[in-house]
Amino acid sequence: VAGEFSLGDLAVRFGLLLRGEPDLRVSRVATLSHADAGALSFLANPRYRKQMQATRATVVLVGPDHAADCPVAALIDPNPYLAYARIANLLHPQAPPDAGIHSTAVVAASAHIADSACVGPLAVIEDEAKIGERVFVGPGCIVQRGAHIGADSRLMARVNVCAGVRIGRRCILHAGAVVGADGFGFAPDAGTWVKVPQVGSVQIGDDVEIGANTTIDRGAIDDTVVRHGVKLDNQIQVGHNVTIGAHTAIAGCVGISGSTTIGERCMIGGGVGIAGHLTIADDVVVTGCSLVSASIRNAGSYSSGMPAVETRMWRRMVAHLRRLDGKER
């Protein structure tokens, strides 16, 4: 926690309209239902309005449409969730790593590690790897031969950055992420398979976040590319030679087949499957559990699949479909 901040200071610092006493102070964030004195909360979804009306927070970040319903001090902004994100980063800053290399880490003689970096217990840094300023390499991480980690990036426990991979500045790789494993490339040979060497690498831009147990395969020949500002949730599979455009956000359990290009500022919902060798335009939204089997050339929102219904209803629908099929025959 960074300390206490007055509401007046927060209003000036972040360009917010304050309704309430400017000398009131907050030191932490909390949900509307669990906040107490000294806590800041927010209302971004109207369904939680009743919780706001009963909150004990010192102040609530709220949009203009709901400010009148707030029983405590209000910091008013058209985008309260964005304002909350910025203030939460101020109140709960990421502590800088303690510089140094743990005694149990294994570091190759030819590796270059910045003096301000932190290498945790049982980490392995291989030949010619480069670890930038203020980088945190967590317990059990492996940074393979020739990989580069940009300044201020953080590798949580047991991240594997494979040979030759480039990670940009201010990136966060959560526990168990693997960047640069072999892509799924096999040539059929009379009922068997011959492995195709995966000789490309992976290029990760600046300010990228990669969720726990997400895997990004190295390119077959050219590199797999994740551009600046991309946000990847947990358990995503990114196939070889995929390109993900800047500031695209992808939710958990998405599978992206090889050689597909996703544009900038896209939002991909959880559980989406994307076939290979496709192009998805900038500013596309794909809703959860959809199947993308053809390229999407225009911005907009796209969906497929059927929402869950009661089992009885589902069985009736399937029965109707079967009868329709019988009529066609």
Please provide the spans of the model-predicted regions.
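Structural signal for interior beta-strand "rungs" in well-ordered beta-sheet cores
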Residues: 42, 100-310
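Terminal amphipathic alpha-helical/low-complexity segments used for targeting or macromolecular assembly
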Residues: 1-104, 165, 170, 176-177, ...
